[in-house]
C-alpha cells in the first residue's frame, strides 16, 4: 500500500477555487503538485493553462499538464450526444467526475507515488463507522456534492477537500488578502464546460453541420417533427426531438392559450408530446449504474432525501433493489419532470449516500 505522506496531487483548472485550494494545502504543510487536465478548450482558448502554470510558479509548486481531450470526447461528449439522440437528458458533469476526472487524478498520482488527491470542489468529507462519505459544503449555494455520488472508497479515502468549509466570497477574499488579485476576480464557470451557453446550439453544430468530423460519424441528419398533445393530436412542427428535454416550457416556438410542457420524447417517430405541468408528475423511478456507500443507511429507510437536479428541490423517498438489479425509488410526494438520463443523488443525516442514472420513470 502506498505510504500516506504529505504529498498531494491537486487538479488545477486555473480558476479561483483550485487556486485557493493550492494555497490552503500549502499552508497546511502539504507538498503540492498541480495537474491541469486538457479536457475541452472552449473556442480554442488555452488561457486556463497559462494561468495555472503561472500560479504554480508563483507558489513554488510543481505543475504538469495532461492531455485528456481524446478520452473526454469519447467518454463525455459522445455520450452527451448519444443520450440526446436517445431522447434522454444527460448530466455530463456527473459522468466526468465519477468516471474520468477523479480516476485520472488517482492514476497520475499513483504513477508519481502520491497518495492524496485534491480539487477545488465545494464539498466536505467525513469518516463514520468504517466508511468515508462526501458531505455537502458549508456554502449551500456552491455545494457540488450532487456530482460525486459515484466515487468509491478507494478514491474517497485519498481525497483532500480544502474548499468544503469556505464560501465563495471567503475564497475570493482569501486570495486577495494574499496578493493574488487576479485569482480573486476570476469569473465563475457556468454550465457544462463544452457548451456553457446553450446545449442546443452545441448539438446543432454536432448533429446538423455536414462539414463536421465525418471520420467520427458525428453528423446525423435531424429533421423537423411533430408536437402532439396527450391524445396524439397534432399541435405544431418542431425542430427535431433531440433539441427538447422533459419538463421544458420555454423555447418551444409555439403559442397556445395554455401553458404546456414537454412530457414525452419519442426518437423513433421524431414526436414530442406536450401536456400540462400536473401531468408530468411521477411518484417513482428506477436507477441504473448506481453506487451506494453503505446499503444499511439507505435501503428500506423512509427518511432518505433524493435530488434529481443540482441546486433543486429535495424530496423524501424510500429505496429498494429490484430483482433485475435496478434501484427502485418511491417518492413520498410526486415530482415533476423526471427525465431518463438524469442523475439522482441520495442524502441522509447530512451525508451523500450514493446515486445513479434514471433509466425508467414508469413500470414497463
Swiss-Prot record:
Catalyzed chemical reaction(s): S-sulfanyl-L-cysteinyl-[protein] + uridine(34) in tRNA + AH2 + ATP = 2-thiouridine(34) in tRNA + L-cysteinyl-[protein] + A + AMP + diphosphate + H(+)
Name a single GO biological process: tRNA wobble position uridine thiolation
- Organism's domain of life? Bacteria
Catalytic site residues?
96 (nucleophile), 193 (cysteine persulfide intermediate)
Which is one Gene Ontology cellular component term of this protein?
A: cytoplasm
Could you tell me the EC number(s) of this protein? 2.8.1.13
**Subcellular location as annotated:** Cytoplasm
The UniProt site entry described as Interaction with tRNA is assigned to: 121, 342
Q: Which family does it belong to?
A: Belongs to the MnmA/TRMU family.
- List the protein's name: tRNA-specific 2-thiouridylase MnmA 1
Identify the coding gene: mnmA1
Amino acid at each position: 500500500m502506498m505510504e500516506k505522506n504529505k504529498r498531494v496531487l491537486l487538479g488545477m483548472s486555473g480558476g479561483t477555487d483550485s487556486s485557493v485550494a493550492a494555497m490552503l494545502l500549502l499552508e497546511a504543510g502539504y507538498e503540492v503538485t498541480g495537474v491541469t487536465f486538457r479536457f475541452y478548450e472552449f473556442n480554442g482558448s488555452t488561457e486556463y493553462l497559462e494561468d495555472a502554470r503561472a500560479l504554480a510558479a508563483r507558489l513554488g509548486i510543481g505543475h504538469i499538464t495532461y492531455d485528456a481531450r481524446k478520452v473526454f470526447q469519447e467518454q463525455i461528449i459522445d455520450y452527451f450526444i448519444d443520450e440526446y439522440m436517445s431522447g434522454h437528458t444527460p448530466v455530463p458533469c456527473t459522468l466526468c467526475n465519477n468516471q474520468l476526472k477523479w480516476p485520472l487524478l488517482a492514476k497520475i498520482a499513483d504513477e508519481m507515488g502520491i497518495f492524496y488527491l485534491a480539487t477545488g470542489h465545494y464539498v466536505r468529507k467525513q469518516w463514520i463507522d468504517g466508511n468515508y462519505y462526501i458531505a455537502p459544503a458549508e456554502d449551500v449555494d456552491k455545494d457540488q456534492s450532487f456530482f460525486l455520488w459515484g466515487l468509491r472508497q478507494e478514491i474517497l479515502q485519498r481525497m483532500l477537500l480544502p474548499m468544503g468549509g469556505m464560501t465563495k466570497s471567503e475564497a475570493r477574499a482569501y486570495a486577495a488578502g494574499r496578493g493574488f488579485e487576479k485569482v480573486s476576480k476570476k469569473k465563475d464557470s457556468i454550465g457544462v464546460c463544452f457548451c456553457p451557453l446553450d446545449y442546443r446550439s452545441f448539438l446543432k453544430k454536432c448533429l446538423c453541420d455536414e462539414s463536421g468530423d465525418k471520420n467520427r460519424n458525428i453528423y446525423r441528419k435531424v429533421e423537423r417533427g411533430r408536437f402532439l398533445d396527450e391524445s396524439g393530436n397534432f399541435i405544431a412542427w418542431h425542430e427535431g426531438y433531440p433539441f427538447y428535454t422533459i419538463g421544458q416550457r420555454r423555447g418551444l416556438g409555439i403559442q397556445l392559450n395554455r401553458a404546456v410542457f414537454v412530457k414525452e420524447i419519442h426518437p423513433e417517430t421524431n414526436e414530442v408530446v406536450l401536456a400540462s405541468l400536473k401531468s408530468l408528475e411521477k411518484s417513482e423511478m428506477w436507477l441504473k449504474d448506481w453506487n451506494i456507500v453503505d446499503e444499511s443507511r439507505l435501503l428500506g429507510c423512509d427518511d432518505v432525501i433524493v435530488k434529481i437536479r443540482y441546486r433543486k428541490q429535495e424530496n423524501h423517498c424510500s429505496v429498494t433493489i429490484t430483482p433485475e438489479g435496478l434501484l427502485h425509488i418511491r417518492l413520498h410526494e410526486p415530482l415533476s419532470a423526471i427525465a431518463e438520463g438524469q442523475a439522482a443523488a441520495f442524502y441522509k443525516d447530512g451525508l451523500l449516500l450514493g446515486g445513479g442514472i434514471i433509466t425508467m420513470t414508469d413500470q414497463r
